Amino acid sequence: MIKLLYPEFWQKRNIIAYLLLPISLIYQFLGYLRASLARPIMLPAKVICVGNCSVGGTGKTQIVMYLAKLLKARNVSFVIVTKAYGSNLKSATTIHQGHTALEVGDEGVILAKYGAVIATKNIKEIVPLINELKPDIIIVDDFLQNPYFHKDFTIVSVDSQRLFGNGFLIPAGPLRQYPNKALDAADLIFLVSSHQDKIPKILTPYVNKLINAQIVPSHNIDKTKNYFAFSGIGNPERFFATLKNYGLNITGYKIFPDHYNYLQADLENLYSLAKEHNATLVTTRKDHVKFNDLNNNIVCLDVELSINHPDLLNEKIFKKA
């Protein structure tokens, strides 16, 4: 897993991006070789795969949460499979209430509030657990580039601000794969944090399967206080923008690497920064679950997905999956 902040050259090419291109070519070749040699397995239920083409937050977790609520409302049984980023997980496990983010990943802890969740780093290990749970649908979070299992329905999430960055593969750029193939194969494309009617040029060929989505706060936060914001997620800028758009007075920011595991020393430093700014700490749900075992008084901004075409989503999901 790449534990980096999103470097500027991933968005706008410079000499560093070009110097890293030879490594990107190796990455591309290894990906091609992996896909060529893979023998995909059929999982024992219909599979909805939610993924993206690039490193960094694109709203996948919120899409998975939305799908979970949608399926639950239809009384469709489902299991969520998550990748256990940032955890010390050794083998696939069904998440229970006592699990921590360090054991199963921050996303797993969050998603477990919406239904049964299996955390794994190897997709093939989930089969016995799926057979025990017997779901109608498997929602797979962030295995889009994994060639070892069959996908019945794919959703590609795209951040409206970053799109596909500088267009280069890792590490010269943010791309896990070039987008055209993924977009062509996708059943739906979510353009996340899009507040405008204008569709980016690269997505215009896919307008018939494009859904505009916004990530919005799902609860009220006291707007009379000052806040010092911090996060260790893939797209912290979007989180900070959400805070400002919500009308909070943000006096300072601190960014940590994606899926960062906080130490007591980090917490003490954050409290010190908040005190300097006469502010209360505020963070994301993904970060907040890391502090379960630490004495803290941190405000958590919970968010949810709002989409412009729920009927299109319902039609495609229940028609094909």
Swiss-Prot record:
| GO annotation terms (biological process) | lipid A biosynthetic process; lipopolysaccharide core region biosynthetic process
Q: In which pathway does it act?
A: Glycolipid biosynthesis; lipid IV(A) biosynthesis; lipid IV(A) from (3R)-3-hydroxytetradecanoyl-[acyl-carrier-protein] and UDP-N-acetyl-alpha-D-glucosamine: step 6/6
Q: Which UniProt keywords apply?
A: ATP-binding, Kinase, Lipid A biosynthesis, Lipid biosynthesis, Lipid metabolism, Nucleotide-binding, Transferase
**Catalytic reactions of this protein:** a lipid A disaccharide + ATP = a lipid IVA + ADP + H(+)
Q: Which GO terms describe its molecular function?
A: ATP binding; tetraacyldisaccharide 4'-kinase activity
- The regions listed as transmembrane in this protein's record are none
Q: What class of enzyme is it?
A: transferase
Q: Where does ATP bind?
A: S54, V55, G56, G57, T58, G59, K60, T61
Among Pfam families, the record links this protein to: LpxK
Q: According to its UniProt record, which protein family does this protein belong to?
A: Belongs to the LpxK family.
PANTHER family (UniProt xref): TETRAACYLDISACCHARIDE 4'-KINASE, TETRAACYLDISACCHARIDE 4'-KINASE, MITOCHONDRIAL-RELATED
State the name under which the record lists this protein. Tetraacyldisaccharide 4'-kinase
Please name the source species: Rickettsia peacockii (strain Rustic)
